[in-house]
Every structure is written in structure tokens, then in C-alpha cells.
Regions:
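Conserved short hydrophobic patches within well-ordered secondary structure
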Residues: 12-16, 112-114, 164
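A general structural signal for short secondary-structure junctions and capping/turn motifs
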Residues: 40-41, 86-87, 174
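Surface-exposed loop/turn motifs in large extracellular/passenger domains
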Residues: 15-18, 35-39, 78-85
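Glycine-rich hexapeptide-repeat left-handed beta-helix
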Residues: 2-5, 29-36, 44-81, 93-96, ...
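N-terminal segments that cap or nucleate solenoid repeat domains
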Residues: 1-27, 33
């Protein structure tokens, strides 16, 4: 690990796969307890991050009644999946990324997670996802590329958040959010298209209006200029 900066107070398990030019800040803990952690290159981890903490159960806890994952065993740490983090990600202070159970918890590339975010087991973040401070994602959620989640938003487990989505601050997300949507409130509702983002990406204004009508159920198809962003 000679090309990585690891603060003297940070703990990095010996079996963590670590690329190059990563910075791991004070009092962060990466890996351990049977969790497999793989980290690419050029990532920044702030202070007090916890990467790869597995679930724990007390003796006699009837986990079969709570979990749907057939391969889980509280007595066999080798059955815990891990955490995979790609390249050029920023995780600010006090970010927690839990180990997966049935699949790795994954953060792809160029993601930015502000302070005090929690990513539970089996979540998947595609490229260029942004979490504002205080976002909490329950387990098995997935986030499409370029999705942005506002401050202190909370997401129910198992949800799919589409690509180029904007979720407002303090939202309580209890249902899936389609691609290109603007969603906010408690419970969060899709109120139209993520207009500002599409305009900044160069989508013609008329096509943005058409995409808004589609998300409101007024038309049957998205314009090609919008669909091409998913490629």
C-alpha cells in the first residue's frame, strides 16, 4: 500500500484490496470481521468512516423470520458478502457502508457521499451518484447513474431510484422513482421531470416538456434525446 495515504489512527484490515492513490482519514475502519472489501484507485475517505461492517445477531435470534436471503448464516462469517468501491469516489466524514448479505454493497465510480450518510447492505450506486449530508438508504436499494439525493432523505429498503433523478431534502422515499424524475415530500412523490438537470445536459426545452408529460402519465413515450442519456 505504499502509494496510498492511511492516517495513523485509521484501521485497514490486512485482506482489504486497495488500489493506488487512495486517502483514508483519521479513525476510519475499513474491512475486518470476515468482510471482503475491494477499493479501486483515487478515492478519498474522510474521518470516522466505517466501510464493511457486517450485520450482527445475538445468540438465538430468529433471523429466518426477518431475512429473505437463503445463504445467510449468523455463525459463518464467510457467507457475508463484501463491499466494492470503484475509482474517484469521495466519502466525506462519518459515512457508513455496510457489507452485503446476498451480494456486495457497491459504489461505482465518481460518486460523492457527503458527511453522515448511511448505506445499508446490498445497495448499489451507479456512476456519478451524489448523496447530500445525512442521507440514509436502507438495504438492497439501487441508484441509477447521475442520481442526486437531497439532505436527510430516507429511503425504504429494496427501492430502485432511476438515473438522472433528483430527490428533495427531507424526503421519505417509500416507492420506486423512475428515470429523470423530480421527487420530494413525505412520503415522496414524483412531481415531474428533473428539468434543470436535463436542460443543463443540453436536452431541447420542448423535449424536456415532453419528458415531463411522460412522467405525469400524459404521453406514452420519452423523446429520443432523453432516452439517449441512458446509453
Amino acid at each position: 500500500m505504499p502509494s496510498n495515504f492511511i492516517h495513523p489512527t485509521a484501521i485497514v484490515a490486512s485482506d482489504v484490496e486497495l488500489g493506488e492513490n487512495n486517502s483514508i482519514g483519521p479513525y476510519s475502519v475499513v474491512g475486518g470481521m470476515g468482510c471482503k472489501v475491494s477499493i479501486g484507485s483515487n478515492n478519498y475517505f474522510g474521518a470516522y468512516n466505517l466501510i464493511g461492517s457486517p450485520a450482527e445477531f445475538a445468540t438465538g435470534c430468529p433471523i429466518e423470520a426477518m431475512l429473505e436471503f437463503e445463504d445467510w448464516s449468523a455463525t459463518n462469517p464467510s457467507q457475508v458478502s463484501g463491499v466494492k468501491i470503484g475509482d474517484y469516489n469521495v466519502l466525506r466524514d462519518r459515512v457508513s457502508v455496510d457489507a452485503g448479505i446476498s451480494r456486495d454493497t457497491t459504489i461505482s465510480n465518481n460518486c460523492y457521499l457527503h458527511s453522515n450518510c448511511l448505506i445499508n447492505h446490498d445497495c448499489n450506486l451507479s456512476d456519478n451518484v451524489v448523496f447530500a449530508p445525512g442521507v440514509i438508504s436502507a438495504g438492497t436499494c439501487s441508484f441509477g447513474k447521475h442520481s442526486q439525493i437531497g439532505m436527510n432523505a430516507v429511503l425504504h429498503q429494496g427501492l430502485k431510484v432511476g438515473a438522472f433523478v433528483m430527490v428533495g431534502m427531507n424526503a421519505t422515499v417509500t416507492r420506486e422513482i423512475p428515470d429523470f424524475a423530480l421527487s420530494f415530500g413525505s412520503p415522496s412523490k414524483t412531481v415531474g421531470v428533473n428539468r434543470v438537470r436535463l436542460l443543463r445536459l443540453g436536452v431541447p426545452r420542448d423535449d424536456v416538456d415532453s419528458a415531463n408529460d411522460y412522467l405525469l402519465g400524459l404521453t406514452e413515450a420519452l423523446p429520443s434525446s432523453v432516452l439517449n442519456l441512458l446509453k
